[in-house]
Amino acid sequence: MKQELIERFTRYVKIDTQSNEDSHTVPTTPGQIEFGKLLVEELKEVGLTEVTMDDNGYVMATLPANTDKDVPVIGFLAHLDTATDFTGKNVKPQIHENFDGNAITLNEELNVVLTPEQFPELPSYKGHTIITTDGTTLLGADDKAGLTEIMVAMNYLIHNPQIKHGKVRVAFTPDEEIGRGPAHFDVEAFGASFAYTMDGGPLGGLEYESFNAAGAKLTFNGTNTHPGTAKNKMRNATKLAMEFNGHLPVEEAPEYTEGYEGFYHLLSLNGDVEQSKAYYIIRDFDRKNFEARKNTIENIVKQMQEKYGQDAVVLEMNDQYYNMLEKIEPVREIVDIAYEAMKSLNIEPNIHPIRGGTDGSQLSYMGLPTPNIFTGGENYHGKFEYVSVDVMEKAVQVIIEIARRFEEQA
């Protein structure tokens, strides 16, 4: 199993599948289509049935049931794309067997070193086989580790028919990293009662709470005149943007929050005297607090409009996704089965809120409750990203055990 994980994963990460937020195609990049087509062929080779790839790049397949019991159809999902935060082109994975727990020089020429001082969790992987970057790209373990684990688990179940299971559906989705993963996902065609995304991090991760999320785009309109004769005439749009930001509580930003604390995050600010544009994301686990945060944004805008004129500030604000907990709680048994599966494999479940979103956040509100499970990756979205093959193997075992337990308990 370990060699299959290494072979598949190192091959998959070499395919550039970064999504592109500026693209309006689906998927947003051709690399995702190329990767999807490859996976279609490999799913067929493994022995899965009903293997499809639709016009939007969504890959689906079926592991047929090998039991006469009436077992709920479950699904496992991962995403095809990698993050846009750092380059994902020409990924050169480096395999470190029997890792000694010390610093790894990823790139001597560029002096890129993965150190325990910067990443304190690193020594805990002593003795593992870990895969790193060469210091010039991200790795793409998010989410090619999860995707690999699903492929290997399905292959194992096909070749070990003594493990009884119901019908299992598999899906690989595009554009998750830019929040569009579920946009064209056909829940009805997928046909599962519930699913799990394999899109987590370190060993034991089990997540079924996510942020409530909104995005706010603010346009500040100024009046530009010659600065020498600007008195009582000029209105500086960039200063309006600064004034707006000054009304938000300083301590309620990502760099000051953790756990269940929400925040306002200024993602970008661009402009000049004539016009400036700011983009914020608003996040909170509690729905009432989430609505209160949006009200705060709206109230600041109203105050500034009263002060400077209606056209001085224009707000566009949209909800992006909601806390999946609301949809998971009524079917809590899907979390319990994953929890029990981990415990039976001597894995200590680490239940914590996702300070972000997964495809599962949106899919849960589309009628497919979908918690998230660990994959073994660390330091996602950058050159210090790595994955433990030993933990990937544990994730495969969890997938197999979940499928087995659903059949056993049917």
Curated annotation (Swiss-Prot):
Annotated InterPro entries: ArgE/DapE_CS, Bact_exopeptidase_dim_dom, Peptidase_M20, Peptidase_M20_dimer, Peptidase_M20B
Gene Ontology CC entries for this record: cytosol
Pfam name, any one: Peptidase_M20
Protein residues bound to Zn(2+) 2: D142, E177, H381
Name by which UniProt lists this protein: Peptidase T
Group of enzyme by EC: hydrolase
Cofactor dependency: Zn(2+)
Chain positions recorded as Zn(2+) 1 binding sites: H79, D142, D199
